Amino acid sequence: MDSSNASLNTAEAYCAKLHLSDAARADLLAKAARSADPLVEVHHLLAGEGFDTENPALSSIAPRLKMALDGAERHGEQLESRAFTEDLQGRVRLATMPTLRRASFTSRPWSPNPLKALFRSIGRLLLGGGSQRPEEGSAAVPEPDAPMPAGRWHVAASVRRFILVFLVIAQTVVATYYMTAVLPYHGAHALEVAMLILYAVLFAWVSAGFWTAMMGFLQLLIGQDRYSINSSKVPDSKLPGGARTAILMPICNENTARVFAGLRATYDSVMRSGQGAAFDFYILSDTSDPDIRVAELEAWLLLCREVGGFGRVHYRRRRHRIKRKSGNIADFCRRWGSAYKYMVILDADSVMSGACLVRLAQLMEANPSAGIIQTAPRASGRDTLYARIQQFATRVYGPLFTAGLHFWQLGESHYWGHNAIIRVAPFLAHCSLPRLPGRGALSGEILSHDFVEAALMRRAGWAVWIAYDLDGSYEEMPPNLLDELKRDRRWCQGNLMNFRLFMTSGLHPAHRAVFMTGVMAYLSAPLWFTSLVLSTALLAVQTFAVPQYFTQPNQ
């Protein structure tokens, strides 16, 4: 008697977890109570004709999933075809990802030694500029395959950069001349020579930032930019059927509630735009914490139930975390990338409006030679004092520098790795990143992959733009100084690694300059410190030197 009561209690506890009305649950328990094993009978009643005596629980998976997902029916979803699939053993499971569309995304190793590359370039010039044969094992320079590799903007970009170089050099020469005049030995002492060299380098770095901000200010003041990618004449019409876009959110051990809240806001905004059929969403998880993995899957299931997102909002977790974020995106490209014309990369803290996403896809359609269009995300969403100071600062000077970068770079701009749209086909063809050979901190997986991907995209003839005047793109700042330092350390290492690729064959000078500015962003600090040390040493020399009042005998 006690055994039968225990079995019935187990069945009652089990039914309490099922997504049933009270009346349906009571009816199911009443029928199951007449059996010798109530729990097995519950599975029998749920499975119906598909009941398997050897695997009672397994045979009732499909009806239990349907009961759990009945909220999706309110959204008009075809539950059978979109929410469920079968594995190779014929078992019913949730369709977290679409059918595979495999594509090749491979790369050949490169030789990233800048000195060797420099010597090879000098050798080619001395020998008459023969054909550029790649070193054994290195990646060959691809032929440009974009519709308009140069673009009508290319002449304007060349003229603007010539002006920038002239302004920086002229300003640096004048400043160095006056600096020489105020030094005690007027540049005749060895310490002063070293100081002047550092001064010229650092002043040129500051001058480049000054002219970038100045031109950004003038650009925003005038308000008209004929070369802005956002000024393209694009009809605000429905996207064509072939312009399917995948919105990717790579995550790794993130705050699950925050991630899915941001994704929900983006999804709802896209649906309100009336262009939702052109977009699919992918949560690409590299999470290693088992508790967070469970929370992510539950959050995905809840999101799909609430918005009817089965078949449109997908979730994939990698078991083997290879090459971090770039490897996460590469895995998507190999498995499903060929099914889409474009993809938008989001960070875990990113939010983008539907109008912004639709506009990006329309700009891609209107500019067939554009490979990447990067938005200028606004910092928002944090409430700590440190983050609010950072948000205020980026709101003040961020638009100036972004507009200035666009003015000088045009279609050879930065890509920051998120809040940007990418043309999938050339990305698959040209932007796979091999590991950097060697040992140590500056080898292995490329950390600042975004700069390298932009350089490779432009090397193949595709333009990289910054849509600095496009609204609707947001990101969050680190909430405290420790998180800021962790991120900055990663960026510092990544930019120093990228300098190994500075002399890679075929890269455009504009992107070589991007690599150099990335290095200077962190190298300038020790250079300033060295300048202070030299100035202190010069002061000591001048202080302790014995003055010579008489330069000739018997004076």
PLM features per residue range, with description:
Residues M1-H19:
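A short, charge-rich alpha-helical start-of-domain segment used by transcription regulators
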Residues L8, S21-A36:
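Conserved RNAP core-binding helix
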Residues D37-P63:
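Short, charged early-sequence alpha-helical segments and their helix-coil boundaries
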Residues L58, A62-D145, S269:
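Membrane-anchoring/interfacial helices and their immediately flanking loops
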Residues L125-I169, P184-V193, I222, R226-V234, ...:
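Basic/Trp-rich segment in TM-proximal cytosolic loops or flexible interdomain/linker regions
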Residues R152-V259:
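N-proximal low-complexity "stem/linker" segments adjacent to membrane-targeting elements
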Residues W211-M214, L218-L507:
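Internal catalytic domains of large membrane-associated glycosyltransferases
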